[in-house]
Amino acid sequence: MDDLFSLAPPLPSSVECDRWIEHLFSARAAINGHVVRRKARDVERIVGWPRFRFELRRRGFTAIRNGAQVVIFCNALPLHKV
């Protein structure tokens, strides 16, 4: 029986992580202070939650995970549950 983990793709390099973060926060919506969303699986797989949280704090942004999606509020405004 094959090793289950041998089928998994290799972990991305630090350069790929940096490029993914740069791509995310250079989206027009992010630049204009709006909302962007990404798959939670991609955040975890590509950059990891600690790095993702660090990048959010560094920019003063907030993110919410709902199911398989992460919604990123690209501004420092408070959130109000409706």
Kindly label every feature range from the protein language model.
Residues 27-61:
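Short, contiguous, helix-prone interaction/anchoring segments in small proteins
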Residues 50-82:
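Short, compact, well-ordered microdomains
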Residues 1-35:
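An N-terminal amphipathic alpha-helical segment
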Residues 13-25, 49, 74-82:
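A signal for specific C-terminal beta-sheet/loop modules enriched in small/flexible residues
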Residues 8, 27-30, 40, 63, ...:
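A sequence-composition feature that detects small, non-aromatic residues
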